[in-house]
Amino acid sequence: MVAAKKTKKTHESINSRLALVMKSGKFTLGYKTVLESLRSNKGKLIIIANNCPPLRKSEIEYYAMLAKVGVHHYNGNNVDLGTACGKYFRVCCLSIIDAGDSDIIKSIPGDH
């Protein structure tokens, strides 16, 4: 029961940090733009929803590994990730280019 509370707390903190990035930082939403940001070495952190298709997920992880960028697997589906971003559409993956006022890049250890 304590573990569930801890995951909920971290989930909420990730959501609040994401909201801060959306307000003050630079980011790209979507598969194609995430790959573009990785190819041009602009992305600092990649966040992927847990229902992202396996082939797409592995391709993003591969590009992130080449660019030495952290990948965070978001604990929620693409609808949840879209809501956390403050959007009214689904978001499968997003790339944080500039965190702005948020400390999301330091706080989330990328799963290398």
UniProtKB/Swiss-Prot annotation:
InterPro entries, A to Z: Ribosomal_eL30-like, Ribosomal_eL30-like_sf, Ribosomal_eL30_CS, Ribosomal_eL8/eL30/eS12/Gad45
A Gene Ontology molecular function term of the record: RNA binding
UniProt-listed Pfam families: Ribosomal_L7Ae
A Gene Ontology term for the protein's cellular component: ribosome
PROSITE patterns according to UniProt: RIBOSOMAL_L30E_2
Gene3D superfamilies membership: 3.30.1330.30
Source domain of life: Eukaryota
Keywords, alphabetical: Ribonucleoprotein, Ribosomal protein
Family of this protein: Belongs to the eukaryotic ribosomal protein eL30 family.
Protein name: Large ribosomal subunit protein eL30
Protein species of origin: Euphorbia esula (Leafy spurge)
Upper classification of the organism: Eukaryota, Viridiplantae, Streptophyta, Embryophyta, Tracheophyta
